[in-house]
C-alpha cells in the first residue's frame, strides 16, 4: 500500500478559517526536515489548496508511477557541514487542477472519494512524518480522514507487520481572539469524540514584532490560545507572532503588474528594472527559511512534538 512507508501521521486542525494552518503546517515540516526527518505534506483542503503556492511550486505536476501518484519534491535529503537534512515532498489537489484558478465545486461524496484516493493512491515511500493540512471545521474531509486513519490496522501475513501508519495525533492552531478559540474548542471536542490524540495547541499571529524597534503590538490580543489550552486540558506548545520575513519568503515578493504607478510616481518600466537588479536567492526554501526568526519557534515546536510522539506522550 502507498502508506506502507509512512511511520507517523500528524493532523493540523482548526475550527476556524484564516488562522494560518497551512503556514504552520509548512513551518513544522521545514523544522522537522532540519532535524533530519523525511517529511510529507498532504493538503486535503480541497476547495482552497494553499500548499502549492506556499512552497513556490504552483506549476508542478503530479506524475504516475507503478506504486501510485508520486508527490512533488520540494527539496531532497542532503548532508551539509555534517548536518543531515531530510527530504520534503507534498501532495495537493492544486497540482491536479488544469488551471490554478479553477474553482472546486464538489459535494460531500466526491470529497470523500478524493480523500480516500489521496490516502490509497499516493506513493510516499519511506517517510518519517506525514503532516495533513486540513480545511477549517469538522466537515466531510475530516470525517473521511478519521474513518480511513482510525480503522484497525490490518496485518499483512507475508510481511507479518501492520500496513497502516501510526496516527500520532493532531496539532490545533488558533489565533488569540475569542472568535477563533471558541471554534477551536469544537475541534477539541471533535478529537475527543473520534479519539484522535491531541499533541498541543499553537497560538498563531500572537502579536506583531516591529522589525525596526522590536516592540511587540498585540494586533489580535494575546494569550487566548493558552487559556483555551489550559481550560480544555490540552498542552500549549507556544505562541508565534506575525513574521513578515516568512510572509515575504512564501509570497516571493511578487510584483503586482496591475499597479500603473507607485506612490512615489515610479513607472512600471522603472519598477521592472529595479526588480531585475535584485539578487535572486537560489537556495532551497528550507535554507532560506532558516533566516526567518520564526524558525527558532518552530524548531522548539518540532523538538517538543518529536519527544511526545517518539516518547509516547499525547493528550
Curated annotation (Swiss-Prot):
Question: Biased-composition ranges for Acidic residues?
Answer: 257-266
Q: Could you name the Gene Ontology cellular component terms for this entry? A: cytosolic [4Fe-4S] assembly scaffold complex
Question: Which is an annotated GO molecular function term of this record?
Answer: ATP binding
- The entry marks the following residues as binding ATP, namely 15-22
Task: Please provide the record's keywords in A-Z order.
Answer: 4Fe-4S, ATP-binding, Cytoplasm, Iron, Iron-sulfur, Metal-binding, Nucleotide-binding
- Name assigned to this protein: Cytosolic Fe-S cluster assembly factor cfd1
KW Transcription regulation (keyword) present: no
Query: Which proteins does it associate with, and in what oligomeric form?
Result: Heterotetramer of 2 nbp35 and 2 cfd1 chains.
InterPro entries to which the protein is assigned, alphabetical: Mrp/NBP35_ATP-bd, NUBP2/Cfd1_eukaryotes, P-loop_NTPase, YlxH/NBP35
One Pfam family this sequence matches: ParA
What job does this protein perform? Answer: Component of the cytosolic iron-sulfur (Fe/S) protein assembly (CIA) machinery. Required for maturation of extramitochondrial Fe-S proteins. The nbp35-cfd1 heterotetramer forms a Fe-S scaffold complex, mediating the de novo assembly of an Fe-S cluster and its transfer to target apoproteins.
Region Disordered: which residues?
253-282
**Family as reported in the entry's similarity comment:** Belongs to the Mrp/NBP35 ATP-binding proteins family. NUBP2/CFD1 subfamily.
Compartments annotated for it: namely:
Cytoplasm
Q: How is the cofactor bound?
A: Binds 4 [4Fe-4S] clusters per heterotetramer. Contains two stable clusters in the N-termini of nbp35 and two labile, bridging clusters between subunits of the nbp35-cfd1 heterotetramer.
Tell whether Secreted is among the UniProt keywords.
no
Needed co-factor(s)? [4Fe-4S] cluster
Which one GO biological process term can you cite for this protein? Answer: tRNA wobble uridine modification
Q: Which SUPFAM superfamilies does this UniProt record tie to the protein?
A: P-loop containing nucleoside triphosphate hydrolases (SSF52540)
Species assigned in the record: Aspergillus oryzae (strain ATCC 42149 / RIB 40) (Yellow koji mold)
Name of the coding gene? cfd1
Q: Which residues bind [4Fe-4S] cluster?
A: 210, 213
Compositional bias of kind Basic and acidic residues: 269-282
